[in-house]
Amino acid sequence: MNQTVNVIGAGLAGSEAAWQLAKRGINVRLYEMRPVKQTPAHHTDKFAELVCSNSLRANSLTNAVGVLKEEMRVLDSAIIAAADECSVPAGGALAVDRHEFAANVTEKVKNHPNVTVLHEEVTEIPEGPTIIATGPLTSEALSAKLRELTGEDYLYFYDAAAPIVEKDSLDMDKVYLKSRYDKGEAAYLNCPMTEEEFDRFYDALVSAETVPLKEFEKEIFFEGCMPIEVMAKRGKKTMLFGPMKPVGLEDPKTGKRPYAVVQLRQDDAAGTLYNIVGFQTHLKWGDQKEVLRLIPGLEQAEIVRYGVMHRNTFINSPSLLKATYQFKKRDDLFFAGQMTGVEGYVESAASGLVAGINAARLIQGKEPVTFSNETAIGSMAHYITETNKKNFQPMNANFGLFKELGVKIKNKQERNEQYASRALETIRNISKTL
């Protein structure tokens, strides 16, 4: 019981992991290289510094990330407690004073008697129980060691993710199921376009606003994966020879080949989520919504994850991790945070919470806990370890990842309330066993 756990990185995930360990009586060696070595995005030496927005998104239980927060409150999350204490008015969202928030987390974790903080860069993966939570801007030296550990093909340095939509929100009268040239099983939903519809879509796409690039993203940005808006600007017909190619996708209703086709590919095992093939994008989210709703069948599409392209060091978790956030080849090594493929502040902290709980259980000689995918916490762990390893991209919390209810509820709010009610009952039962 006198073993020490190394936690590398004092961001949202690392700070939460350290707290969960320390409160269970486990000694923690918490490494944070700032301020000795800064990242291109951070400005302080504080733990859990929010480098982008100051919003932790929705607080309502009719939203998956709101359910995730409530689950974390049940499990005594340091991050959510700090956010609640440092909140600022933000309507239905939980937003914080970022300076007070970081100071709160830093003080709480740093002052715990079981935590020793070391401000130094870690350049080797330590032996003994360890949680790696170094985030999307992991240092070059540690990235090199992670590449050695995971293999060249399992470590990525940027996101290039297409939008994901809920199948239930699509107009199925306008789309059809088919694979190109009818090869294999019919695996894609196809949205056919006339020339007029394509022209309208094209004009909206090339005039939409993009997110400005940060300086440290520019060098790696377009390696091997071109945003759909950049492709469009190369010529009006470029997309017709790329992701919107209609060849081999005749519409079964007409027997004719459409002028253009947008394909959607199943993204989860339950078949509730679909990604838009080849539509990785850097458009602003409001513009994405407007442009995508010009696609036939997607007029009322619910977007559960917007397309993103940004610097992000992450591993191929389906190949490498268990749902307990343990490395498959080494039980005393855990990963947490955005590095695992969870997307978002709250999701990152939640993964740290699970890694911290399970590292403590390992030292205590107990079985690591696998959270049910009836919960938001468990649905994230399930997604990053069970999804298709060939097309793995980071994901944020959404009800499409939850285990299905088993009953069809048409009203979206009622359906989400049922997801929330079941999740919180499950998490309270789990919390009694921890």
Swiss-Prot record:
FAD binds at residues 9-14. One of its GO terms (biological process) is tRNA methylation. Its EC number is 2.1.1.74. It comes from the Bacteria. Transmembrane segments: none annotated. Coiled coil: none annotated. Keywords: Cytoplasm, FAD, Flavoprotein, Methyltransferase, NAD, NADP, Transferase, tRNA processing. It catalyses: uridine(54) in tRNA + (6R)-5,10-methylene-5,6,7,8-tetrahydrofolate + NADH + H(+) = 5-methyluridine(54) in tRNA + (6S)-5,6,7,8-tetrahydrofolate + NAD(+); uridine(54) in tRNA + (6R)-5,10-methylene-5,6,7,8-tetrahydrofolate + NADPH + H(+) = 5-methyluridine(54) in tRNA + (6S)-5,6,7,8-tetrahydrofolate + NADP(+). The keyword Phosphoprotein does not apply. GO terms for cellular component: cytosol. One of its GO terms (molecular function) is flavin adenine dinucleotide binding. It is found in: Cytoplasm. Its cofactor is FAD. Pfam families: GIDA. Belongs to the MnmG family. TrmFO subfamily. Catalyzes the folate-dependent formation of 5-methyl-uridine at position 54 (M-5-U54) in all tRNAs. PANTHER family: GLUCOSE INHIBITED DIVISION PROTEIN A, METHYLENETETRAHYDROFOLATE--TRNA-(URACIL-5-)-METHYLTRANSFERASE TRMFO. This is Methylenetetrahydrofolate--tRNA-(uracil-5-)-methyltransferase TrmFO. It comes from Bacillus licheniformis (strain ATCC 14580 / DSM 13 / JCM 2505 / CCUG 7422 / NBRC 12200 / NCIMB 9375 / NCTC 10341 / NRRL NRS-1264 / Gibson 46). The lineage of its organism: Bacteria, Bacillati, Bacillota, Bacilli, Bacillales. The gene is trmFO.
